[in-house]
């Protein structure tokens, strides 16, 4: 492979699309079952009561109620109070 750049070439010019991660429903908000609460990579937030974790670590509500953020030991957890 050439170690010098050819005429009019560049090593830059690539960027990935934003993945729209983050908290989608905040503490105190009323949600229905199936609503996405947090989109994340890895488990920054862990599922609490009435919350499950999807294959891509997304947290979603399993029941209708009010969102609550808290701690479960040292872990940050998201729960839904019915």
Curated annotation (Swiss-Prot):
GO terms for biological process: translation. Residues 1-21 are annotated as: Disordered. The keyword Ribonucleoprotein applies. InterPro entries: Ribosomal_bL27 (IPR001684), Ribosomal_bL27_CS (IPR018261). GO terms for cellular component: cytosolic large ribosomal subunit. The keyword Ribosomal protein applies. Keywords: Ribonucleoprotein, Ribosomal protein. It comes from the Bacteria. One of its GO terms (molecular function) is structural constituent of ribosome. Belongs to the bacterial ribosomal protein bL27 family. PANTHER family: LARGE RIBOSOMAL SUBUNIT PROTEIN BL27M, RIBOSOMAL PROTEIN L27. This is Large ribosomal subunit protein bL27.
């Amino acid at each position: 492979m050439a170690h010098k750049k050819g005429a009019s070439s560049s090593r830059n010019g690539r960027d990935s699309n934003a993945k729209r991660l983050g908290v989608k429903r905040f503490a105190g908000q009323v949600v229905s079952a199936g609503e996405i609460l947090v989109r994340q990579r890895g488990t920054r937030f862990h599922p609490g009561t009435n919350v499950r974790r999807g294959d891509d670590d997304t947290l979603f509500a399993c029941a209708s109620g009010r969102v609550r953020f808290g701690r479960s030991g040292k872990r940050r957890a998201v729960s839904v109070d019915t």
